[in-house]
């Protein structure tokens, strides 16, 4: 065998050794599998609503909640109004996703008669995806009415003059920035403030002492009962602590008879 041929054979053998591992598999990095972390669940109107997070390694792909249609269908038509409102559920987001999603917990409200302003006086659900702890939420008393210096494009933070009966119950004549104790202020799209007919769905942004603290898909019962998937535009929220989702979709599964409320496309945490 010539020296030149021997060199070629050695080169090919060595190169082949770098291309395969001992078990014959490629040495290229394998794709990290996608997993779903389970959060908390609660019985709401005879059905279980649960939070979850879809992860790929340490990266958050989606955060959301599973909402069975039974929890919508069985919502009572008449409820006694209390102040401040009490959530039908308070559910933690999975630990693994909190920091990288900017979301800590979900508080869900059933508004049988709706609430201010005009277009929101229709039966609907409020899904508050909060970026602060439950203790911080419960400490909100609407005494410091500092408004944020900047709002998302196309949003407003209106004040609402209350009728006498509501004013007596709430203890104020005007809801500054639509501030609700144990919730915060509510910034809403200006098109929904000006709307004459009842809303079907809206993406609300919440504030406390000038800082953003939640994003809220506000969705009418009528829309949810259509059992159809839909999207809502996510605003860019200045001052939000942590990552922000740039997409929201309510995806209906006819076979499972449930919605998945999905936040996705998260930015890097601030």
Residue map of PLM features:
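Non-catalytic accessory regions used for complex assembly or targeting
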Residues: 28-36, 40, 116, 255-262
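Beta-strand-enriched cores of mature, soluble protein domains
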Residues: 108-113, 125-130, 244-246
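Short N-terminal edge-element motif at the start of the domain
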Residues: 31, 41-44, 57-123
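Bacterial N-terminal signal peptides that target proteins for export
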Residues: 1-8
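Phosphate/adenylate-binding glycine loop and adjacent helical scaffold
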Residues: 32-33, 45-53
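Bacterial Sec-dependent N-terminal signal peptides
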Residues: 11-35
